[in-house]
């Protein structure tokens, strides 16, 4: 595969191969000089900590070099240069590009003009395929993906991680339960598509209605940066919170995931519970992204 733009570009076999490669890497079965002499460009036009740094760490662990542009203002786009021209220029310097951009569809556009592979690190409310791969890898570490009941809680309208994850889950025998504040439900078109693909999607009003049925609880923050105004954001902020009390009586093996950053949707007391896997999930970004880089560059 030349590019990683959307999880829709993957079939189940491709996902399983990447997860297997990430597992080998996690067990130190890789060449630390495989990317020697290779250069990765990270173009991040939205804030990022985990995605940007884990790609940098992944490239470094494979022996390569990263060049990072971390703001619109620091690029010639601030002078009026188009994204397409920026990509054309940068692709002449490097062996692959990782792009994060606020506009949905920007990564696909970049892949069409780039002379090197492009990895989508998030395009607005669109897709985030590398996050989905590490989410699946984290689930697989605890249980088979087939047969799980997974609950998605939070901003499912603007949250690109859930958009990517739900489509990937449609490739497995998973039941998807959704709980969202008013107006932040999973887009109806996506729900319809998932059901057309044969995936059971069950919508709930409250997390309490379903939490004891879940094998995985995937929590997301309210995407403040996607809201048209501050008032709209504060109308739904702090409308849900995962606490130790809420998790009492859930399945013994149930895990809590979160793509991070969190705001106040998970009580810090949960961090020490055996259910909490979100920091492990974040750490899994390095081996998963190493596997991706090996595929697109090596």
Swiss-Prot record:
Enzymatic reactions: carbamoyl phosphate + L-aspartate = N-carbamoyl-L-aspartate + phosphate + H(+)
GO biological process, one term: 'de novo' pyrimidine nucleobase biosynthetic process
Transferase among keywords: yes
Cited function: Catalyzes the condensation of carbamoyl phosphate and aspartate to form carbamoyl aspartate and inorganic phosphate, the committed step in the de novo pyrimidine nucleotide biosynthesis pathway.
A molecular-function term among this protein's GO annotations: aspartate carbamoyltransferase activity
Involved pathway(s): Pyrimidine metabolism; UMP biosynthesis via de novo pathway; (S)-dihydroorotate from bicarbonate: step 2/3
Protein name: Aspartate carbamoyltransferase catalytic subunit
Quaternary context: Heterooligomer of catalytic and regulatory chains.
Keywords: Pyrimidine biosynthesis, Transferase
EC number: 2.1.3.2
Xref: PROSITE patterns: CARBAMOYLTRANSFERASE
Cross-referenced SUPFAM superfamilies: Aspartate/ornithine carbamoyltransferase (SSF53671)
Species whose genome carries this gene: Methanosphaerula palustris (strain ATCC BAA-1556 / DSM 19958 / E1-9c)
PANTHER family per UniProt: ASPARTATE CARBAMOYLTRANSFERASE, ORNITHINE CARBAMOYLTRANSFERASE, MITOCHONDRIAL
Family: Belongs to the aspartate/ornithine carbamoyltransferase superfamily. ATCase family.
Chain sites annotated for binding L-aspartate: 79, 160, 221
Residues the entry annotates as binding carbamoyl phosphate: 50-51, 100, 128, 131, 260-261
Gene symbol of the encoding locus: pyrB
